[in-house]
From Swiss-Prot:
Changing residue 66 to R: In strain: Mutant ts49. Keywords: Virion. Transmembrane segments: none annotated. This is Core protein OPG073. The gene is OPG073. The keyword Manganese does not apply. Induction: Expressed in the intermediate phase of the viral replicative cycle.
Length: 129
């Protein structure tokens, strides 16, 4: 399971948030783990953002000051070809890919940068546009 709209920015490049999904762990526990990992870089209790999780399908969750809820699928595909690295030394910030219907308000910790990138790629009748 991985986040497809939130990444770490590091001294070496962009890093994915991914957690190996095991059958004995429910999805809500994994979402909480993603939020826990993000809490090292942003103030969760003061921030509002969306988590788009991809396993076999894409699921949307909203984190509003620490309260997490599932939201309707907006059919955004988050399919831009992005480059990622595995090895890094220093985290410099967090990157959020947002859409016109997924606003965010992020309060960073410890001088971390917050980067926002907008996408409008949606899934229409079997096509990614």
């Amino acid at each position: 399971m991985e986040l497809v709209n939130i990444f770490l920015e590091t001294d070496a490049g962009r890093v994915k948030f991914a957690i190996k999904n095991t059958d004995d762990v429910c999805a809500s526990e994994l979402i909480n783990k993603f939020v826990e990992l993000l809490s090292e870089y942003i103030h969760i209790d003061q921030s509002e953002f969306y988590l788009v999780v991809k396993d076999k399908d894409i699921f949307y969750f909203k984190c509003d000051r620490g309260s997490i809820s599932i939201v309707n699928n907006e059919f955004y595909v988050f399919d831009e070809p992005l480059l990622f690295v595995k090895d890094f030394t220093n985290v410099t910030g967090v990157e959020f890919i947002v859409t016109e219907t997924m606003p965010c308000r992020i309060i960073p910790k410890n001088n971390h940068a917050v980067i926002s990138v907008v996408t409008n790629h949606k899934f229409y009748n079997g096509l990614s546009l």
